[in-house]
Amino acid sequence: MPSPPEPPLHWRDCRLEPILGFPRPRELAKSLEVQGEEWIALLESGGGLQHRSRYSFLAWGRRKSSETDAIRAYEELERLADDKCRALPCRSPTFFLVSYEAVVGEEPWLSRLVGRHEWPGMTAFSPEYVVVYDHAGGRVSVCPGDTPLPAPASRKESFSAEGPTYETSRKGFEAMVADALERIRAGEAFQVVLSRVERYRVWGSLFSAYERLADANPSPYLYYARLGGRVIIGSSPELLVKLEAGRVETHPIAGTRPRGSTPIEDIELEVELLNDEKERAEHVMLVDLARNDITRVSIPGTVQVTSFMDIERYETVMHIVSRVEGVTRPSTTFVEALKALHPAGTVSGAPKPRAMEIIAELEEEARGPYAGAIGVAGSSAGEAAIVLRSAWLLDDGETLEARAGAGIVYDSKPEREYMETVQKLGSLKRALGVDMCG
């Protein structure tokens, strides 16, 4: 496949500065938070994964924004996506979050099953100011060029949390797993990804919690977003979709182990994971599902698995990751590519329609941001991560919600799947400073 062109970082109305000595993304975002800015999107790259860690974005101020229900989420995002944004990074991206339930826009029959969440089906804004950090090129582009940078924050923001004040109990989650196993063994599905929720009471600035999370668990997709009265923080490892120069890709993650306490134990767990027949079979199935999804917007014969079953390590867990790519049909928009892949099979199951039905029946409440998509959208270019290892503020302004899931297949053990959700929530709970007992 042809490589995308080297992106120009110096747009006509922007100023270009060396990255050395320029305020870091988090420093500027913290200053904006302290000053009371209502619209902020900070998308950072970390984790040392060079193929996914070149750019970080900071955007603030609101030129236009939109919030809509799940049924109209894709349609409204298509309307907002800037038609001048055709390559990444772009001068005028739309920053967005689409909920898991936005799938009802393409699968309306699901609307009778899924509930409504406090968060909208889609929320997005086009910023007044954008700063793009090119870590590989050592450059920063400030747009527009006369953008006044916020003064350094002079006060330290406090944060504290307690809880969980509510959670899906171990007994309740293991009962859900047992129910899903009966359905899988009856032939209704091959895999169902079930999640459990935890809620915490919080005080102070969530930006402080984001800083702790980003430091403790650097990932390719770190984000802090203040969208009017809504706030979300996250450290996602998984790319849902990237579209650039007529090429679309997704990076399915399936297969998890906890990190070892020593380098030797870490290697032993990696070998165990890669040789686990259940984990391998689950991963292959979800790679095939990703191939099928990408085929919906790709030229026949162009879809390829360009890397297969690599190991990526994070603070508390390691994962098996693959990469699937295709060449898109002419005039494919970013939102069309997003629709083809959302929600990912890695957070729903296979076959996807029946798995989503079972999820709705067993979880009994809307997921909201969890397993949705967050990122930047243009007309024919964009990039979005799956909302994982994340927490979002509810409408009362003092309750933070988080979810984690596990893929259930025919030989799953309920207690093991519960512990996987505990491990996945580990970094987030440490950042919040709440009880880690599982």
From Swiss-Prot:
UniProt pathway: Amino-acid biosynthesis; L-tryptophan biosynthesis; L-tryptophan from chorismate: step 1/5
Disulfide pattern: none
GO biological process, one term: L-tryptophan biosynthetic process
Residues where chorismate binds: 255-256, 370, 389, 405-407
Keyword tags: Amino-acid biosynthesis, Aromatic amino acid biosynthesis, Lyase, Magnesium, Metal-binding, Tryptophan biosynthesis
Domain of life of the native organism: Archaea
Amino-acid positions noted as binding L-tryptophan in the UniProt annotation, renumbered to this chain: 45, 220-222
Catalytic activity, reaction form: chorismate + L-glutamine = anthranilate + pyruvate + L-glutamate + H(+)
Keyword Lyase belongs to the record: yes
Binding-site residues for Mg(2+), renumbered to this chain: 282, 420
Cofactor binding note: Binds 1 Mg(2+) ion per subunit.
Annotated GO MF terms: anthranilate synthase activity; metal ion binding
Modes of activity regulation: Feedback inhibited by tryptophan.
Any Pfam family hit: Chorismate_bind
Cofactor requirement: Mg(2+)
Assembly description: Heterotetramer consisting of two non-identical subunits: a beta subunit (TrpG) and a large alpha subunit (TrpE).
Known function: Part of a heterotetrameric complex that catalyzes the two-step biosynthesis of anthranilate, an intermediate in the biosynthesis of L-tryptophan. In the first step, the glutamine-binding beta subunit (TrpG) of anthranilate synthase (AS) provides the glutamine amidotransferase activity which generates ammonia as a substrate that, along with chorismate, is used in the second step, catalyzed by the large alpha subunit of AS (TrpE) to produce anthranilate. In the absence of TrpG, TrpE can synthesize anthranilate directly from chorismate and high concentrations of ammonia.
Protein name: Anthranilate synthase component 1
Species assigned in the record: Aeropyrum pernix (strain ATCC 700893 / DSM 11879 / JCM 9820 / NBRC 100138 / K1)
